[in-house]
Amino acid sequence: MKNNKIKKQEEIPDELLRESPKTENTAELSEQIVDWLSSGDYIPCKPEELIENMDLADHREDFITAMCELEDKGRIVSMKRGKISLTENSPYLRGIFRANAKGFGFVVPEETFSSRLDGDLYISSENTCGAVNGDTVLAAQIKSSRSGNGKSCEGIIVHIIDHELTELSGTVEPVPPLQRESRCSSGLCVRPDKSIYNFLVLLDDGGSTLPHIGSSVQVKLLSYPDKNGCASGVITEVFGESGTTDAVYASILYEYGIKPENGGGFSDALLLQAREISDRGIIYDNSEEHTGGDLEGRKDLRGEMIFTLDGADAKDLDDAINVHRDGDGWILGVHIADVSHYIKFKSPLDCEALSRGTSIYLTDRVIPMLPRPISNGICSLTAGTDRLTVSAIIKIDANGNIIGTELCESVINSKIRGVYSEFNDFIEKGTNSEYYDKYSVLGNMADDCVQLYRLLERKSKERGALELETSEAAILLDADGNPTDITVFERGIGERMIEQFMLCANTAVASCLNRKKIPCVYRIHEEPSPEKIHNFAVFAHNLGLNVSALGAKNVSPESISLILKEAAQKEIGTVVSYVLLRSLMKARYDNKCSPHFGLSTDMYCHFTSPIRRYPDLTVHRFIKLMINGKFSRKELKEAEIFAGKSAEKSNENELRAILAERAVEELYKVRYMSGFINEEFDGIVSSVTSFGIFVELPNTCEGLVPVSGMNGYFVYNEELLTLSDGRTIFRLGNRVRVKLISADIVHRKLEFSLVGTNNGDTVSKEKNHLKYNFRKKSMKNKKFDKRKNHNQMSDIKRGRKRHRKKRS
């Protein structure tokens, strides 16, 4: 950047900034201005010249308003001598400010500006212009230099375009002496819980009673930090005493907009509607009021051996299966609760489901997408009860290929309420199983199910679907909801079998809708970026893995699978999987068909969980559109538009659910570990950063060993993901012994100190990169997280070598 002396953005002259009412022409005029500035013939000029050049003298007021709005949004800037330019054509750049607790931060450039820098733009604490973490800002580069890791750039924030932060949680404190000169009638302030918000929020009592000092509260910001580091705000919620589990839990729920009361935060009106639907039940064809009834046009499968298979505590049984041989091949039936029959499009219950997007599976409870009379009642495929379903009847050849799919509305009557642990025991022990009598009624179907599962799994491996080795915590609670133990969740053949069947059904449905040119909410997973794959290849190569299969331009799932397979053979699969996960794109919903990289499929969608995922409910409606075959071009176009909006909303809600689930899980982990202060544990280095190493314990609890607590001067190598002082090298996979120093309930963080390593002072030897043997515990008859396993995993295989998980 040529101009390194920029300290603040030149302003549009004051005489052009007087108040001007916004008119209907403003938005259109703004685009005209942008188009004019974008033209190749444009030479930067002052606003008055621009008015003249664009022949807008008669629209001066609208022009001024439009210019101010464009400047506020960071789309235009005023350069030297007040000349106007598009931000893209100026020395400035737009981006998101990411703050550090110490006051400095980085601007992450928008894609349009990212090519200007090798990385993010460093902003020192004195050059933040009062920006808060998450703000969209306008910045200028003021310095660049070369460091060991490449080009280092420093900049200054010149304008805050938009504040992301509007509310925060924190603890009520007295205003510190240094800030007492600030206007604060109450003498109280809130110190934010998150350290990246390194400012105070002054409270004005406004004539109302404020919570006592030490209260955990939610604050709505009225103003943002000034030069003294003080913002102002009003309290909107009081969670309780700061530092208590209840207060932290309440603040998490509030942060993510989760309402646990009244069966999941549903209004009385919605609950009444749900109960009426559930109580009405199925209307049969002998009803005088409803000729034909709910069964009209449905395939009657009530006489077939169909069964459900779920966790022992599951109540929302939304999928059932049956399998039988078909010559050399197979017929797989996947029967899903027909939620769309009861939840009509754009009804109040449907609008609520769309706004939620997904059920949220917290450690101690489930916040359902639909009221329980629907999810646990009329739409739950209870054994011995007629239930309306949408069925995918899939024909599979001897090689595991899908050669035909029938999608239909159906009615079933499940014969068995299967439980994973029981089914696994039955498959393993046969006639010696205590559950033999229950499952022997399946006859040959039990063996057929297992054989088909093994065929589909083998086909998945041949296709190159990624098999990542990660672990999931199972948090055991007592009757009062207190954590009593944390173990690694183990999966048996039943869980893996259902997973494969659901994956098969989802793939078949996506293919059918795509072939018929019917809209669909696809689940897509894009290829990782070349840069991320390069970094992964460097890491894997330094572990002694063969990375020659990774092409520079066209990375395939098969090439990555070869590396994962070799890593598993060398017992470093967990370490490699952790790094690979960070290199991959996030799976998301889209109305445009695109391959799923992790599953190595050309197309994929979510069909199997309409009770708890809105995209699945939308897909069911599109299936019915295809089955009925009566639709106009206009209806098809409207369906396509809704698919796009639904996908976008579902992506937002999925992220919200993931973050909420993770936050609550972290809280329970820290709460559990708080009983083990000063105790020592063996662990594995799970992440390496410039500020320390993260260590994961056998029970999946993770904490930080800060670099400040290590003996020696450690240097971080970003490319190799190592931290070294010249004698000792820490890298992912190292086994270490640590002592628990603190368990911070408020910030949900554990801190460790190093006690020693398995290889003395040096931990860089390759033999130390061993697969971590997690402690195994039987989960039989123990209460833990009630999530439904085959629908709450990621799209990519996860879990230990024998306990992989996947979102179906």
Label every model-predicted segment.
Residues 1-28, 714-720, 755-808:
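Acidic, low-complexity intrinsically disordered tails
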Residues 2-333, 340-386, 424-427, 671, ...:
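Charge-lined substrate channels and their catalytic hotspots, especially those that engage the 3′ end
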Residues 52, 206, 213, 218, ...:
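Electropositive polyanion-binding surfaces
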Residues 106-110, 122, 189-194, 694-699, ...:
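Short, acidic/hydrophobic/Gly-rich beta-strand patch recurrent on exposed beta strands
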Residues 135, 706-755, 760, 765-780:
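Intrinsically disordered, low-complexity linker and terminal regions at domain boundaries
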Residues 139, 219, 688, 738-740:
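A generic structural signal for residues embedded in beta-strands
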Residues 169, 245-250, 404-406, 752, ...:
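Short, charged, solvent-exposed linker or helix-capping segments at domain edges/interfaces
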Residues 239, 313, 526, 742, ...:
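Residues that form ligand- and interface-recognition hot spots within folded domains
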